[in-house]
């Protein structure tokens, strides 16, 4: 599937687990388009943030069941990607600068 670069990466994931991975091993977490491949994620992150990506690991997160009163619904499944950057590269969006 042909996705535009800005459509591949949806948003950064700012969680405690993602912060530990970023501090320990230069891994940054993103929510990405469900149909995006690892190669597309790598190209998108390199182009959007002007960094060199060494590795991309992806996982499909299951949507949670949600209730509103008696009605039961389900949030959709989504994909997250852990991106490892080259030594010395950082993404300012995560650094807070």
UniProtKB/Swiss-Prot annotation:
Provide the Gene Ontology terms for cellular component: ribonucleoprotein complex; ribosome
Write the record's keywords in alphabetical order, separated by commas: Ribonucleoprotein, Ribosomal protein, RNA-binding, rRNA-binding
Write out the GO biological process terms: translation
By its UniProt entry, which PROSITE patterns does this protein fall under? RIBOSOMAL_L23 (PS00050)
RNA-binding as UniProt keyword: yes
One Pfam family recorded for the sequence: Ribosomal_L23
Q: Which GO terms describe its molecular function?
A: rRNA binding; structural constituent of ribosome
Q: Which InterPro entries match?
A: Nucleotide-bd_a/b_plait_sf, Ribosomal_uL23-like, Ribosomal_uL23/eL15/eS24_sf, Ribosomal_uL23_CS
Against HAMAP family, the record matches this protein to:
Ribosomal_uL23_B
Q: How does it assemble?
A: Part of the 50S ribosomal subunit. Contacts protein L29, and trigger factor when it is bound to the ribosome.
Q: What exactly does this protein do?
A: One of the early assembly proteins it binds 23S rRNA. One of the proteins that surrounds the polypeptide exit tunnel on the outside of the ribosome. Forms the main docking site for trigger factor binding to the ribosome.
Q: Which PANTHER family match?
A: 60S RIBOSOMAL PROTEIN L23A (PTHR11620)
Task: Report the sequence similarity comment from the record.
Answer: Belongs to the universal ribosomal protein uL23 family.
Question: What protein name is recorded for this chain?
Answer: Large ribosomal subunit protein uL23
